[in-house]
Amino acid sequence: MVKLVCAIVGVAGSAFPVDTDASQLVGDLKKAIKAENAMTFTGDAKDLQLFLAKQPVDDESGKEVVPVYRPSAEEMKEESFKWLPDEHRAALKLVEGESDDYIHALTAGEPILGSKTLTTWFYTKNNMELPSSEQIHVLVVVPDGAGGSASDTSRMDRLFDKVDKVYEHTVLSKRTRYVHSEMNSAKGNILLNDLKIRISPVDTVKFAGGVPTPAKEFKWKSDRTEEQQKEPYREYVVANIGDVLTNNKLCVVGVEKGVNILTVEVPGRDIVLAGRTDMIVLSDIAQKFPHYLPHLPGVRMLIEVKKVVTTASEFQALSELIALDIIATESVMALLTNLTNHWQFFWVSRKSDDRVIIETTTLIAPGEAFAVIRTLLDQSPSAGAEVSLPCFEKPVKRQKLSQLLPSISEASGSSGIRESIERYYDIASMLGPDLEMARAVASQVARSIPTLSYFS
């Protein structure tokens, strides 16, 4: 028995699990999908089109493309293709019912034939890995005219759909979305350039005052993934700073997948940062009452853990720091570490000319790194306060991005339209769809388009 997560393309909140047997025909899977969604469509199950939700790969230009398996290429048999992670940008937009270029690319490919078994289609023809949790496996495309109820094709719903599309093109399309876990050098440099941020490495000095409290490196287990070792490495961190946590009423919380607590819009910019980090150091009230975690009470720092640290890892940590700084009231710090010989700290430092400076420094000894963390957590998080940290060349003065980022005004001819559409969505989210208001917004949009204003 295998559990597949399926998602209906174009329908918000339509991701659902289906239990099936890999030896069954794809046609049987279609019947199971229809049974799970009897109210969504009424057509024959055989008319559904199914597509594999493959994780994209980057081509030579860095663009995400759909991987294609060629059985004749021996090198392609060495590693299976991966399923689409549920935190990938395309997956997040998919479950929200939004369009995405990569989803379009997947559904433009070859649909799964109903006469084949899942085993044949998944593994023989496409060399996919075994399905697991936190993935999307099958994309479902419902044929036109197969909607469930008469209201699906009513004039009101068509009007709402048009407003949705205008909202997408006039508001959402102007926003650039960066997912922390998908950051790389190209995306990272674009983000830093857009925000006028420059990275400035600073040197370290010999540990003053004797020898730091010894700390062993974390022992990674080769037969387990990073995610499977999340709790052991959280306990490792707590064991090395537990006294300071207790004294300052703090805790270290491991952030679960899907809990995107570092999702935020950059003020004054059409930029959205999305996702999470691995661990957060914050007030211990978040441990007593886990439902407070999204509010990040008393947050002091984030810790991004990578078994192997790469350049992309650095840009991920920077993206997370920017998001946390925007969300948090006080100044914060980020740590990127493999928990062995790479302990890299990042903080918002100052402004130089028209650029915000984020400084970074790296330690290689766990004992020295934990001495820095203990000292940091013992100090006031107030922005602008200088903190002398072990092994740091000079006192650290952390600032807030909100005080340093240049303000950008959204002077645009479409701002009135955008405000009207956003206001419509705010009201609709509380009171439900309003036909008359939708008509008024649509009329305003039409009047703003020269070609259509003649008819309005």
Curated annotation (Swiss-Prot):
Q: What induces it, per record?
A: Expressed during colonization of the host plant tomato by P.infestans.
Where in this protein does the record put region LQLFLAK domain? 18-54
Q: Where is it mainly found?
A: secreted
GO BP, sorted A to Z = symbiont-mediated killing of host cell
Q: Which residues are glycosylated?
A: N338
Enumerate the InterPro entries for this protein.
Crinkler_N (IPR045379)
- Listed GO CC annotations: extracellular region; host cell nucleus
UniProt keywords, alphabetically: Glycoprotein, Host nucleus, Secreted, Signal, Virulence
- Region described as DWL domain: 55-136
Q: Where is the signal peptide?
A: 1-17
Q: Where in the cell is it found?
A: Secreted; Host nucleus
Pfam families this protein is in? Crinkler (PF20147)
Where is the motif (HVLVXXP motif)?
Answer: 137-143
User: What family is it from?
Assistant: Belongs to the Crinkler effector family.
Domain-level remarks: The CRN proteins have modular architectures that include a signal peptide, a conserved N-terminus, and highly diverse C-terminal domains. The conserved CRN N-terminus harbors a distinct LXLFLAK motif, which is followed by the conserved DWL domain. A highly conserved HVLVXXP motif marks the end of the CRN N-terminal domains and forms a junction where diverse C-terminal domains are fused. The conserved CRN N-terminus mediates the translocation into the plant host cells.
Function of this protein?
A: Secreted effector that effector that induces cell death when expressed in host plants. Induces the expression of defense response genes in tomato.
Q: What is this protein called?
A: Crinkler effector protein 2
The species this protein belongs to is Phytophthora infestans
Upper lineage: Eukaryota, Sar, Stramenopiles, Oomycota, Peronosporales
Q: By which gene is this protein encoded?
A: CRN2
